[in-house]
A protein has these predicted regions:
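Bacterial N-terminal signal peptides that target proteins for export
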Residues: 2-18
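Long, hydrophobic/aromatic-enriched structural stretches that serve as scaffold segments
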Residues: 79, 83-107
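Short, charge-rich binding segments
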Residues: 85-88, 113-120, 127-135
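Boundary of Sec targeting at the N-terminus
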Residues: 30-31
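Surface-exposed loop and membrane-interface regions of Gram-negative outer-membrane beta-barrel proteins
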Residues: 97-125
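Outer-membrane beta-barrel transmembrane domain signature
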Residues: 34-41, 46-48, 52-77, 88, ...
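Membrane-embedded beta-strand positions in outer-membrane beta-barrel channels/transporters
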Residues: 80-82, 121-125, 167-169, 213-215, ...
């Protein structure tokens, strides 16, 4: 995705994944939404006192395999820094927007390593706390992302790289002592990549259209939360961040 394909998801990535669900009627469920920011709910359930806004920052590393026209495969790694702002119209619904910068990474192909130059990403997403009994919780998310970057092979001119991504995910977790929230996460995603390889325009997509992993949310204070998440299966990723409700 996520600023190429991996970065598109970071805002999920983002938006395919990790969040800003800093509300809950009675419990304090926590996870990571598609935007990637810690999602811990609050004890305050009255409409007049619960937070209606949240913001977060996160960092993320991803590693995956891409497949382009002509059965050309590429190994991709990316690093990114992300920021997100969310509006919480109800105690279970979060509407969010994110922006970020992919700071580095590469595409490794038969002709060598194509380095990514910094580029922007953007995303729009929605999170829904579908179930929460005060101990266990289920969070669902959907995010649409776009990313723009350039790649450069040593000795050659830089070329454009654009990606679109739609990611749908779910997290199931448990509240431990009202402080720790371990969870399992599954996401499915897809979308096109537009690039130029060896002088020709090509399109591609991820060889893996899923993520399976786990994470941990930590309640640092009434309004401040942090998270770390690892994805070993599918599109591999490691992310961490903090979220603040207000």
């Amino acid at each position: 995705m996520s600023a190429p394909r991996c970065a598109v998801r970071w805002l999920v990535a983002l938006l395919g994944g990790p969040a800003l669900l800093l509300v809950a009627p009675a419990a304090r469920a926590c996870g990571v939404s598609a935007s990637g920011v810690a999602s811990c709910s609050l004890a305050e359930h009255a409409e007049e006192v619960r937070p209606h806004w949240a913001t977060g920052v996160s960092a993320l590393y991803t590693s995956t395999e891409l497949r382009f026209d002509g059965s050309v495969d590429a190994d991709q790694t990316r690093y990114a820094a992300l920021a997100a702002l969310a509006y919480l119209p109800t105690a279970t619904l979060v509407l969010q927007a994110g922006v970020g910068v992919a700071l580095g990474g590469s595409l490794t192909l038969p002709d060598g390593k194509h380095e990514f130059l910094p580029g922007p990403t953007g995303s729009l997403g929605v999170d829904w706390r579908a179930w929460d009994d005060g101990r266990f919780f289920l969070l669902l998310s959907a995010v649409l992302s776009a990313s723009f970057a350039r790649t450069q092979l040593p000795g050659a001119e830089a070329v454009g790289y654009q990606a679109l991504d739609l990611r749908i995910g779910g997290q199931f977790g448990v509240d431990v002592a009202d402080v720790l929230r371990p969870y399992a996460v599954a996401r499915a995603f897809g979308g096109p990549i537009f690039w130029q390889y060896q002088g020709a325009d090509v399109s591609g997509t991820d060889a893996h259209h899923y993520q399976l992993g786990a994470g941990l949310g930590v309640r640092l204070s009434r309004l401040l939360n942090a998270f770390v998440e690892g994805i070993p299966l599918g599109e591999q990723a490691l992310s961490l961040g903090v979220g603040l409700a207000f």
